[in-house]
């Protein structure tokens, strides 16, 4: 079969979820939170790598890159930092983190649908390699860009972005329901779409 309907439905469901999270301002709020709590350029890179990897494990990595790239550019511009280390961190961490679950990237979705491996078992096998990959990404970027990442404090400009709380609650319930369904062994594709 050239086209696997279950994989396409799973991809569609995860992208719809990411679209609603975007409408709720989840990604903007996350970016602001990361900037507030990272304090330094190196701390920002660490936070960006870990957040990108974590989000990419549960949302499709391509979607995470698309949603976070404009926010990363906005953050580094407001903090007067070079964009390259952070953009590389975003894309590399998204790829590394996405290997942890079936929902992280389309290739894993195909594996998940075709293999019938339980979601929790796949995570048990792949979480450590994903985490180690994220640490390697961080170490390589810190080494490559040691001169471009100054030792100074950074602060966000302006108040936190407004969040659609009602939609955020709905999205949180949807994410929790999807994860429960995945771990319960229900079909990945239809769990994500419902």
Feature-to-residue mapping (PLM):
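Hydrophobic alpha-helical transmembrane segments
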Residues: 8-9, 42-50, 64, 87-88, ...
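Juxtamembrane and boundary regions of transmembrane helices in multi-pass small-molecule transporters
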Residues: 81, 88, 100-101, 120-163
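Membrane-embedded alpha-helical segments and adjacent helix-loop junctions characteristic
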Residues: 2-84
